[in-house]
Every structure is written in structure tokens, then in C-alpha cells.
Amino acid sequence: MNSGYSANIFPSSSSPTLYQSHQLQPNPSATMYQATPRDMGKPPVRGKTSPYGFFVKMCYEEHKKKYPNENVQVTEISKKCSEKWKTMVDDEKRRFYELAQKDAERYQAEVSVAAYGGEDAMRKRKRAKKDPHAPKRALSAFFFYSQDKRPEIQAGHPDWKVGQVAQELGKMWKLVPQETKDMYEQKAQADKDRYADEMRNYKAEMQKMSGMDHYDDDNIHHVVHVEDINSQNIS
């Protein structure tokens, strides 16, 4: 990454220059997605990295690059990074906040997929749990938007995984004009009304068939879409 910024945070005897072009690698100190018993055996989701975390990572990598045979003094470098960070102005820190924002979007998309074991697992769960006679779940405005735009993204990026496509859709949704969002909100409201009507009829039929006095929503299996999870944080 060409940051266009350099700073000396080490003693003059070494004076390595920070932020020269190099590729970021996964942060080994980043927090990991906490797996539940259902998640066992799935690849963990790497946690979000803070702006300061990206800054410190660059300090370490640049020092290691310039002095590969030198034992890294963690305490000393951490101290120098902290001192330098406190003196940096907002313009100098902005790039690290941008990296953190992108990483947060990556994390959100990966957690959404991991929560359901990936796209294949979601399809299997849908086949296994959905009552074929139950009404189709109401879709969100973001989901309707995703239905329209996903083919374009997949055509332009055929190698992208489902998480990457979801992340791009989230970015696009944030930039959609309010007039366009209102159109999709109207679609979502109409679908919500349709679902409510169908669910009332469905419950009535189930009561007749089973002789139950009541039928709880907990007894009805719904299909949950990744886009619905993303839209909770995006809308």
C-alpha cells in the first residue's frame, strides 16, 4: 500500500522509515469470532482490527523488513508506536481508519455467512427445516435490492465468494438514493402484508388439522437469509 506517509519512530541509530509499500497480512493478535458448538469444525472468522491496530502492525512489519536478523523488542516498539500515534494529526490517521472500516465490513459479511455454516449449509438447513406448506418469509428492502443487483456483481466478479458479494452489496446499498430505497421499502412492506395474511390462514389450517387450541410462531420454521442479517446493520 502506497500510503504517501513516512515517520521515524525509532532511535536515530536505526531510524527505519514506516509505511513503505507492502502488503498487509492477517493480524495474529486480532480477536477471533467465538465459535459455538454448532460452529465446531468451521474455519474461524478473523476479528475486526482497529485503526491503531493497523498502525502498530505496519510498525512491526516495517521494522522486521528492515532488520530481519534483529530480535524484535516488543515493548520498545509498542512504546514508540504509541508515542507516535498520539502525535499524529487526523489526516495522517485517516488511512488507518479507512482500513479499519473496510475490515469491519469484511468481518460483518464473513460472520453473516459463518453463522449459517456457509451458503451450502444454509441451503441444506432450508431443505431440512422448512415446512413446504408454510408461507414464504417476507423479504427485506435490502434483499429485494440484492436480488436485482447480485447478478451484475457476480457477472463482473465471477471468482468472488458469497461473503465478498454480500460485502459489495452492502456498500452499494449505502449509496442508493433515498427515492430508490423507498421503492424497495414499498416492495418489502407489500411482501410483509402478504406474509401476515398467509400466516393467519396457515395457522388456521394447522389448528383445524391438529385440533390445537393455539399455534405458536416457535413451531413454524422460517428461512433466514444472509442479506436480512446484513441489512440490520446497513439500513
From Swiss-Prot:
Extent of Polar residues compositional bias: 1-34
Residue ranges flagged as DNA-binding region: 47-117, 135-203
Chief location of this protein within or outside the cell: nucleus
InterPro entries associated with the record: HMG_box_dom, HMG_box_dom_sf, HMGB
Region (Disordered): 1-47
Any GO BP annotation: cell fate specification
Protein name according to UniProt: High mobility group protein 1.2
Organism, as annotated: Caenorhabditis elegans
Gene symbol of the encoding locus: hmg-1.2
